[in-house]
Structure formats: structure tokens, C-alpha cells
Amino acid sequence: MLVKRFQPFLVHLFLWNCLILFALISPIMPSLIILISVPFALIDLWLCFTLGLMLRLPRQRQNTEIRENWISEEKVIDGYPVRWLRTSIDEDKPLAILIHGWNSRPINMEGRSKIFLDSAYNVLLFEMRAHGGNLPVDHWAAMHVCHDFEEVLKIYSNNGWLDNGFIVHGHSMGGFIAQRGLRPELETSKNLKGLVLESPVTSYSLINNATCKVLRIPASLHPWMMKRLLRHYNSMNKDRYTVTDVEFLESPQWGLPDAPTLLIQAKHDSTLGQGHWKHLVDVHSRHDSNFEYHIVEELKHSQERSNEGRDELISDWMEKESLIF
């Protein structure tokens, strides 16, 4: 699959080699042709190589032993074993689904789940593919995980787990997945009662720009690189995962759930910066939505399994929205 990731680089490398070979056998000033071509070739090959680098893979981890009081389950979706942890299901209680962030694992959301357990919820910790010690993948994309999430929501609905309503808490990339998987037009979203977004990703363009900056790609080329990356991505994926344009990958086109939404944002977010939460606030300011947000001084982007300030804000919001049972 590395060949697919770096296919543009390999194709362009072949074409530039062909051009140089042609120049060498050409009777018309071969040295001049090569001299002019080399700078353009180096720039073009570097930009092609970065396309493969931009298709990042999660860090591979070891499986960990399932802790007491958690039940591990999985369902094969599109050839991949999608997993989750859950508590014993009380059919009279609502459900809280928590989605971890990039390079994390579901059990890292256990601390965040306590507030929902204390509020009489069944709790389920959803695992993104290729995380938490699960099987690695050749190519990872948010659209793959969104499809997984939408499919398992159908399973949960068929099991009756969503009948009493459900809340979703998504952290970072987990928040991005939640926004897509809880679109109002989906049948499984009809019993959604609330959404908590903790320092969420809200725009893939912003992710792309940050990656381009790390790769020392000039800012003027960022939009062009994003469009080029989309073409490369679409060539690697099935039609169900196709991304039509850049705007599709950010709120509100990506998804704007029709439920009370609470944004809790780390004030000093060293991972995502300020652009993502500001974009989401702007989107909700232009829509008639039940939206509340808090910028929390004492909250970091990661390593916050327990945070009293965050939990207090969630508890107050749940009480205000009549979500405590």
C-alpha cells in the first residue's frame, strides 16, 4: 500500500527520468535541457512525495487487557473488525457514546465516562479503526471511521440501545467523527439528545494547512496541495468514501447535528490551535442551533482523562438540558 500512497511521486519520478534520458540522446543542447529541468524536477518530486506523507497512519499500539466492568465487542465492517467497549446495558437507561482522539485508545475515555455513569447512563467507548491495539491499516481516513460509526449506530439502534435517547462525547478527531456520524438526515440520529465536543477537529483544510507548514510548503500552495491531495485520496478509495470538494471536509457541510451541543475548548491548544473552535463557533452563530461553548484555562488538549472544570461544565449543561436521569 506504500506504493499507492506514494504513487504520484513514483509516476513523476519515472516521467522526469524519461525526460532526462530523452535529453541525453537529443542532439539539441542536452546539457541545457537538463540544467533547466533539474530545479523544476526537484520541486515537483518534493511536492509529490509530500502527498504520501500527508496521508498519515495512526501509531501502532499493543492490545491491552480489558479492565473489569467493561465488555469488549466487535463487528466486521467493510472487511475490518470495528471494536468498542461497553458497560452492561440496562434497557431502561439512555446511552452515552464516547469517541477518543487521534493516536489514543477508547479506554483513555474512561475518566470522561464517569460523569455519564453517575448520571444513570449506559456507557459505550467507540474505537476508531487502527487504534487501541487493533489491526493496522494500509490507509487511514476519517471517512472510513465515519462509515464505521454510522454502521455500528445501526447495530446499537437495532439492539434497542438508542431507544431511550443517547449522548455523544467526542474528543479531538473523535469530535470530527461525531459531527459527521450524527447528521440529522440519518435515521440513527432521531434519538440523539446531546453532543459534547471537546477541543474538536472541525475542518480538514486546517489540518492540511498545519501539515503543509510542517513540511515547509509555502502558504500560497496550501489550497492547491489540498485539491491535489483530494484527487489522490479519491483515486485510492471506494466510491462510498469519495470527497467531492474541500468544503465538504468542514462544518457545516461535513455535518451539523440537530441536538443541544456543548463545545469545551482548551484555551491553550498546542495540538489544534485556535482555528478549529473559532470556525465551529462561527458556523453555529449563523445557524439557529442550541449551542453553548466554554474556553477553559485549566484544560489541555490531551492527557486530560480527569478534569474537574470540564466535568463540572458538562454536568451543568446536562442539568440545564434535562439530560440527567
Residue ranges of predicted features:
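Hydrolase active-site cap/lid region
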Residues: 187-241
